[in-house]
Regions:
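Hydrophobic h-region of N-terminal signal peptides that target proteins for export
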Residues: 11-19
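Carbohydrate-active catalytic/glycan-binding domains of CAZyme proteins
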Residues: 22-539
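Sec-dependent signal peptide recognition
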Residues: 2-10
């Protein structure tokens, strides 16, 4: 591939924002970010307050005996949109899904690949009015083109379809944001003035430009214009996410860059020259105007991998927890032959660019982080969203999640994934998962237990999200910080909890009231059999 061709990397976008620089912000363990569970340097209890805690990492866990942390894969909710418009085509790509005004809006790039001069496509929108089950493409006609009747292309106020690379609209939830600026979007521009396209990533610093909308379809530039310039190599080439953090009380931006501090295998070579990893940096702002110095995210003591899109976002039921269903790109890892790719209808050229789109494969993994942290936790290295059967799922840059984890009712959550990239069979699939059910403390039939580190809490009762088999159970003992049962809350005082419930209040012989223990350092001992514990919360 020619050096100027960066292989469409930027079509996944997540909530981003822009910055001017201020001192770097790093939140060590000693700092208790509002809404975040942190371990004081003094070794005192972890203050979880009344927040819901999911078992997506080991922060709260002291000991696992015949128990393990288990990642749970989503199930398919069916295909929700396909290529069916003349302005769409094999270059379609999923961006983000938001909830606005009682409906869901899904943003995706429409790119027919029929015009050699068009190296970006354009941002389109679909909508669902039944909670994500069925989707339609509204006839917006914001862009006046006779060959695009009843088109669903989003645009500027003057009808220009300039958005597509990269832009992922997101809802700004900061209190006091004007209704006219509730939906925001960014685009990446080289400082040099060169055009940043899906097929060309100019060398040099890049900046983000902010747009806003009241309805999620017509956008105008913010004024005054926030701006963040990054000189990290290959900044913003897809995979940018941004949101207002309720836990941190500030805007947080995660954006992609090329990390040359760690040398990747020879197959993973930057098209701009040099070996490195597609990675993420984090920066924050109170007002969108002044931003902290970007800090590259770390990944703990785990093997480095290529992350095309990060999709980092607060979990709506526990906003201090940041979940990132990230697109993992296995560059140079071939699963199918050229002939098999051709049989799937794979496009082998974009304009004059001849590319072997069968040489790579992709899936999605679950990265997690917490408010204020500059590291991703990689408790789970295995695949979260699998490619699945069929040659079409084993081509380069397929299986990339869209930004957005949303409710699908009390029992389930939903998110979406882009399949069959650069094929006429491209589509977006709806995925479903148990509410809070990304991972669990899982115990087999033989039985086992999990004991937490010392924690302090506020509230009157302990709520759990759990499931058991017919012979299974969950029982809870509350201990003092030394590990001794507190009278009235010993294991023998807790009847077996049996069933499958998103919400269950734990009871002991004396009842459910735990308020006399609030504010004290305690340990929780969960003794289980044939059971999964997904989350807990004091309320």
């Amino acid at each position: 591939m020619k050096p100027t061709l960066r292989l469409l990397t930027a079509f996944l976008f997540v909530q981003p924002l822009v910055l001017a620089q201020q001192a770097p912000q790093s939140v060590p363990n000693a700092v208790s970010v509002a809404g975040a569970a942190t371990q004081p340097v003094s070794g005192g209890p972890i203050n979880i307050g009344s927040r819901r805690e999911l078992f997506i990492d080991r922060l709260l866990i002291e000991r696992l005996d015949n128990a393990s942390l288990k990642l749970h894969e989503p199930t398919s909710g069916g295909v929700v949109i396909r290529i069916d418009k003349p302005w769409e085509g094999p270059g379609n790509f999923g961006m983000s899904v938001i909830e606005l005004g009682g409906r869901l809006l899904m943003y995706y790039r429409g790119w027919s690949l029929s015009d050699p001069k068009d190296q970006n496509g354009m941002a389109c929108v679909a909508e669902s009015r039944d909670g994500g089950v069925t989707w339609t493409k509204p006839a917006l006609n914001l862009v006046a083109k006779p060959e695009w009747p009843d088109n669903n292309v989003i645009a500027t106020e003057d009808g220009v379809p300039r958005f597509a690379f990269p832009c992922a609209p997101w809802v700004d939830t900061r209190p006091g944001v004007p209704a006219t600026e509730r939906v925001k979007m960014i685009e990446s521009m080289p400082v040099s003035g060169e055009k940043h396209t899906a097929m060309r990533d100019p060398v040099g610093p890049k900046r983000l430009v902010f747009w806003a909308s009241s309805d999620g379809v017509t956008f105008r530039k913010l004024a005054p214009q926030p701006e963040f310039v990054s000189d990290l190599r290959n900044s913003f080439d897809g995979g940018n996410t941004m949101f207002w953090s309720e836990a941190e009380q500030q805007y947080v931006l995660y954006y992609r860059f090329w990390d040359v501090s760690a040398k990747a295998p020879s197959a993973d070579v930057d098209r701009l020259g040099g070996r490195g990893y597609r990675s993420m940096a984090r920066t924050t702002s109170k007002d969108l105007m002044v931003w902290t110095k970007p800090v590259p995210m770390s990944y703990g003591n785990t093997p480095r991998e290529q992350f095309y899109i990060n999709n980092t976002q607060p979990y709506f039921r526990a906003p201090h927890l940041y979940l990132a269903p990230a697109a993992r790109f296995m560059e140079g890892r071939r699963a199918i032959t050229l002939e098999q790719g051709a049989s799937a209808g794979l496009v082998n050229a974009i304009g004059s660019a001849k590319i072997d789109w069968t040489r790579d494969c992709s899936d999605a993994v679950l990265l997690t982080s917490r408010a204020g942290a500059t590291a991703y936790d990689r408790t789970f290295m295995e695949t979260f969203i699998r490619p699945g059967p069929g040659y079409g799922n084993w081509t380069s840059r397929s299986n990339y999640p869209l930004t957005g984890i949303l409710s699908a009712g009390e029992q389930q959550i939903q998110f979406f994934v882009s399949r069959h990239y650069l094929q006429k069979s491209w589509h977006v699939e709806r995925l479903l998962l148990r509410t809070d059910g990304f991972a669990s403390v899982s115990v087999p039939w033989a039985g086992g237990e999990m004991v937490t580190k010392p924690v302090s809490f506020t509230g009157k009762s302990l709520e759990i999200n759990y499931r058991t088999g017919a012979p299974g159970f969950v029982r809870v003992e509350i201990q003092n910080s030394s590990g001794n049962p507190i009278p009235g809350f010993a294991l023998a005082d807790c009847p077996e909890v049996i069933g499958d419930e998103i919400t269950r209040i734990v009871a002991w012989k004396q009842g459910t009231d735990v308020s006399r223990l609030a504010g004290q350092p305690v340990r929780l001992r969960f003794v289980m059999k044939d059971a999964d514990l997904f989350a807990m919360q004091f309320r």
